[in-house]
Curated annotation (Swiss-Prot):
Keywords: Antibiotic, Antimicrobial, Disulfide bond, Protease inhibitor, Secreted, Serine protease inhibitor, Signal. It comes from Pan troglodytes (Chimpanzee). The keyword Manganese does not apply. One of its GO terms (molecular function) is serine-type endopeptidase inhibitor activity. The gene is WFDC12. This is WAP four-disulfide core domain protein 12. One of its GO terms (cellular component) is extracellular space. Residues 80-111 are annotated as: Disordered.
Amino acid sequence: MGSSSFLVLMVSLTLVTLVAVEGVKEDIEKAGVCPADNVRCFKSDPPQCHTDQDCLGERKCCYLHCGFKCVIPVKELEEGGNKDEDVSRPYPEPGWEAKCPGSSSTRCPQK
């Protein structure tokens, strides 16, 4: 009877531990969306993260440039925004026209 009681106790403790660990793993998605990734990869890099919780601060775990990495997310489009707009493109700061020679944005390097 002693060994079967020990076995029941061990199984019970294992189940309680597994349930407790699953409760801690609650994956809360951080704000923003992952930037667009147009890079074609022949081989994926090892992941640097698996969920947003693996990343510090506001960074999200996103697939970018051939592997999962912690990156600064882009803001989601506001309701009624242009759905075809590439939100991952780094737009220059306001007032860039005054700082760039000429009137064409193609003549001014973007950030």
